Protein backbone atom coordinates (compact mmCIF):
# COMPACT_ATOMS: atom_id res chain seq x y z
CA UNK A 1 0.00 0.00 0.00
CA UNK A 2 1.59 3.27 -1.09
CA UNK A 3 -0.44 6.27 -2.25
CA UNK A 4 0.17 9.06 0.28
CA UNK A 5 1.18 6.71 3.10
CA UNK A 6 4.45 7.47 4.90
CA UNK A 7 6.14 5.31 7.50
CA UNK A 8 5.93 7.49 10.60
CA UNK A 9 4.75 10.73 12.17
CA UNK A 10 8.32 12.00 12.01
CA UNK A 11 8.51 11.33 8.28
CA UNK A 12 5.22 13.19 7.78
CA UNK A 13 6.46 16.17 9.83
CA UNK A 14 9.67 16.29 7.81
CA UNK A 15 7.84 15.96 4.49
CA UNK A 16 5.41 18.72 5.48
CA UNK A 17 8.33 21.06 6.13
CA UNK A 18 7.39 21.95 9.70
CA UNK A 19 9.89 24.26 11.38
CA UNK A 20 10.23 26.78 14.22
CA UNK A 21 7.51 29.41 14.44
CA UNK A 22 4.82 27.55 12.50
CA UNK A 23 1.21 26.70 13.41
CA UNK A 24 -0.12 23.16 13.74
CA UNK A 25 -3.79 22.25 14.13
CA UNK A 26 -5.91 19.42 15.50
CA UNK A 27 -9.61 18.60 15.95
CA UNK A 28 -11.20 17.33 19.18
CA UNK A 29 -13.63 14.64 18.01
CA UNK A 30 -11.76 12.02 20.05
CA UNK A 31 -12.32 14.19 23.12
CA UNK A 32 -10.85 12.75 26.36
CA UNK A 33 -9.80 9.63 24.47
CA UNK A 34 -7.45 11.47 22.10
CA UNK A 35 -3.88 10.23 21.74
CA UNK A 36 -2.94 12.15 18.60
CA UNK A 37 -2.23 15.66 19.92
CA UNK A 38 0.21 14.39 22.55
CA UNK A 39 1.72 11.91 20.09
CA UNK A 40 2.43 14.55 17.47
CA UNK A 41 3.64 17.22 19.89
CA UNK A 42 6.00 14.70 21.53
CA UNK A 43 7.53 14.00 18.12
CA UNK A 44 7.80 17.70 17.27
CA UNK A 45 9.62 18.23 20.57
CA UNK A 46 11.93 15.27 19.93
CA UNK A 47 12.88 16.85 16.59
CA UNK A 48 13.96 20.05 18.34
CA UNK A 49 11.28 22.23 16.77
CA UNK A 50 10.19 25.18 18.93
CA UNK A 51 7.97 28.29 19.03
CA UNK A 52 4.93 26.41 17.74
CA UNK A 53 1.38 27.77 17.85
CA UNK A 54 -1.08 25.00 18.70
CA UNK A 55 -4.51 25.54 17.11
CA UNK A 56 -6.89 22.89 18.48
CA UNK A 57 -10.68 22.99 18.39
CA UNK A 58 -10.70 21.89 22.07
CA UNK A 59 -8.25 20.62 24.69
CA UNK A 60 -9.12 18.13 27.45
CA UNK A 61 -7.51 16.78 30.62
CA UNK A 62 -5.78 14.10 28.56
CA UNK A 63 -3.76 16.93 27.00
CA UNK A 64 -2.29 18.07 30.33
CA UNK A 65 0.93 16.42 29.16
CA UNK A 66 1.39 19.44 26.87
CA UNK A 67 2.60 21.36 29.93
CA UNK A 68 6.09 19.92 29.40
CA UNK A 69 6.17 21.37 25.88
CA UNK A 70 5.07 24.78 27.12
CA UNK A 71 7.83 24.75 29.74
CA UNK A 72 10.44 23.83 27.14
CA UNK A 73 9.36 26.46 24.59
CA UNK A 74 8.04 24.00 22.02
CA UNK A 75 4.54 25.50 22.36
CA UNK A 76 4.47 29.29 22.75
CA UNK A 77 0.91 30.04 21.63
CA UNK A 78 -2.49 28.33 21.76
CA UNK A 79 -5.68 28.96 19.80
CA UNK A 80 -8.68 26.93 20.94
CA UNK A 81 -12.43 26.92 21.53
CA UNK A 82 -12.32 25.18 24.90
CA UNK A 83 -9.77 24.11 27.50
CA UNK A 84 -10.45 21.88 30.51
CA UNK A 85 -8.89 22.31 33.94
CA UNK A 86 -5.99 19.90 33.47
CA UNK A 87 -4.22 22.31 31.15
CA UNK A 88 -6.18 25.46 31.93
CA UNK A 89 -5.11 25.79 35.57
CA UNK A 90 -1.47 25.65 34.59
CA UNK A 91 -1.81 28.17 31.77
CA UNK A 92 -3.87 30.56 33.91
CA UNK A 93 -0.71 31.13 35.98
CA UNK A 94 0.72 33.03 33.02
CA UNK A 95 3.35 30.55 31.90
CA UNK A 96 2.54 30.67 28.19
CA UNK A 97 4.62 33.12 26.17
CA UNK A 98 1.54 34.58 24.44
CA UNK A 99 -2.03 34.81 25.77
CA UNK A 100 -4.38 32.00 24.74
CA UNK A 101 -6.75 33.04 21.96
CA UNK A 102 -10.21 31.59 22.63
CA UNK A 103 -12.66 31.33 19.73
CA UNK A 104 -16.15 29.94 19.18
CA UNK A 105 -16.72 26.63 17.44
CA UNK A 106 -17.87 28.57 14.37
CA UNK A 107 -15.34 31.38 14.66
CA UNK A 108 -12.33 29.07 14.63
CA UNK A 109 -12.94 27.53 11.18
CA UNK A 110 -13.99 30.93 9.82
CA UNK A 111 -10.67 32.40 10.97
CA UNK A 112 -8.76 29.55 9.32
CA UNK A 113 -10.70 29.96 6.09
CA UNK A 114 -10.28 33.73 5.79
CA UNK A 115 -6.61 33.69 6.73
CA UNK A 116 -6.75 35.34 10.15
CA UNK A 117 -5.30 32.23 11.79
CA UNK A 118 -3.50 30.37 9.00
CA UNK A 119 -2.45 26.76 9.58
CA UNK A 120 0.87 25.45 8.30
CA UNK A 121 0.31 21.76 9.05
CA UNK A 122 -3.02 20.18 10.03
CA UNK A 123 -2.94 16.79 11.74
CA UNK A 124 -6.28 15.03 11.33
CA UNK A 125 -6.99 12.05 13.58
CA UNK A 126 -9.17 9.69 11.54
CA UNK A 127 -10.70 6.38 12.70
CA UNK A 128 -10.74 5.20 9.07
CA UNK A 129 -8.68 6.37 6.10
CA UNK A 130 -7.50 5.05 2.77
CA UNK A 131 -4.06 5.20 1.17
CA UNK A 132 -4.98 8.33 -0.79
CA UNK A 133 -6.00 10.31 2.30
CA UNK A 134 -9.79 10.15 2.17
CA UNK A 135 -11.02 9.65 5.73
CA UNK A 136 -14.04 9.40 8.01
CA UNK A 137 -14.94 9.20 11.68
CA UNK A 138 -18.02 7.06 11.12
CA UNK A 139 -16.29 3.68 10.96
CA UNK A 140 -13.28 1.98 12.51
CA UNK A 141 -12.51 0.78 16.02
CA UNK A 142 -12.01 4.38 17.19
CA UNK A 143 -15.16 5.68 15.48
CA UNK A 144 -16.15 9.11 16.76
CA UNK A 145 -18.85 10.22 14.32
CA UNK A 146 -18.46 13.48 12.44
CA UNK A 147 -15.09 14.99 11.55
CA UNK A 148 -16.73 18.36 10.98
CA UNK A 149 -14.35 20.36 13.17
CA UNK A 150 -11.48 19.22 10.92
CA UNK A 151 -13.00 20.27 7.59
CA UNK A 152 -11.49 23.77 7.51
CA UNK A 153 -8.16 22.50 8.84
CA UNK A 154 -7.86 19.84 6.14
CA UNK A 155 -8.92 22.09 3.28
CA UNK A 156 -7.09 25.29 4.16
CA UNK A 157 -3.85 24.16 5.83
CA UNK A 158 -0.72 24.41 3.70
CA UNK A 159 -0.13 20.71 4.39
CA UNK A 160 -2.50 18.10 5.83
CA UNK A 161 -1.51 14.87 7.55
CA UNK A 162 -4.11 12.18 8.31
CA UNK A 163 -3.25 9.93 11.26
CA UNK A 164 -5.28 6.73 11.45
CA UNK A 165 -5.51 3.33 13.13
CA UNK A 166 -7.89 2.09 10.45
CA UNK A 167 -6.02 2.17 7.13
CA UNK A 168 -7.69 0.59 4.11
CA UNK A 169 -7.18 0.44 0.36
CA UNK A 170 -10.27 2.46 -0.62
CA UNK A 171 -12.86 4.33 1.44
CA UNK A 172 -16.21 4.58 -0.34
CA UNK A 173 -17.94 7.27 1.73
CA UNK A 174 -15.32 9.66 3.14
CA UNK A 175 -16.06 12.72 5.24
CA UNK A 176 -12.87 14.45 4.09
CA UNK A 177 -11.75 13.96 0.49
CA UNK A 178 -8.21 12.79 -0.11
CA UNK A 179 -7.61 15.70 -2.49
CA UNK A 180 -7.11 17.88 0.59
CA UNK A 181 -4.61 15.47 2.19
CA UNK A 182 -0.86 15.33 1.59
CA UNK A 183 0.29 12.48 3.84
CA UNK A 184 -1.21 9.50 5.68
CA UNK A 185 0.32 7.82 8.74
CA UNK A 186 -0.89 4.56 10.28
CA UNK A 187 -0.39 4.21 14.04
CA UNK A 188 -1.41 1.44 16.47
CA UNK A 189 -4.03 3.60 18.22
CA UNK A 190 -5.35 7.13 17.74
CA UNK A 191 -7.39 7.07 20.93
CA UNK A 192 -9.22 5.27 23.68
CA UNK A 193 -12.86 4.62 22.68
CA UNK A 194 -13.88 4.86 26.35
CA UNK A 195 -12.81 8.48 26.39
CA UNK A 196 -14.32 9.42 23.05
CA UNK A 197 -17.79 9.34 24.63
CA UNK A 198 -17.29 11.66 27.59
CA UNK A 199 -18.46 14.91 29.11
CA UNK A 200 -21.17 16.57 27.03
CA UNK A 201 -21.41 13.58 24.67
CA UNK A 202 -22.45 11.22 27.46
CA UNK A 203 -26.12 10.25 27.39
Locations of regions flagged by a protein language model:
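Conserved alpha/beta enzyme-core scaffold
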Residues: 1-203
Amino acid sequence: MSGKVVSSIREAIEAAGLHDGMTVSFHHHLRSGDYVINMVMDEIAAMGIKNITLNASSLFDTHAALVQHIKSGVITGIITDYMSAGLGKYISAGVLERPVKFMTHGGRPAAIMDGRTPVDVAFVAAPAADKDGSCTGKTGRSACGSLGYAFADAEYAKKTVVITDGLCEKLEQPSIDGKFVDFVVEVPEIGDPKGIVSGTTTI
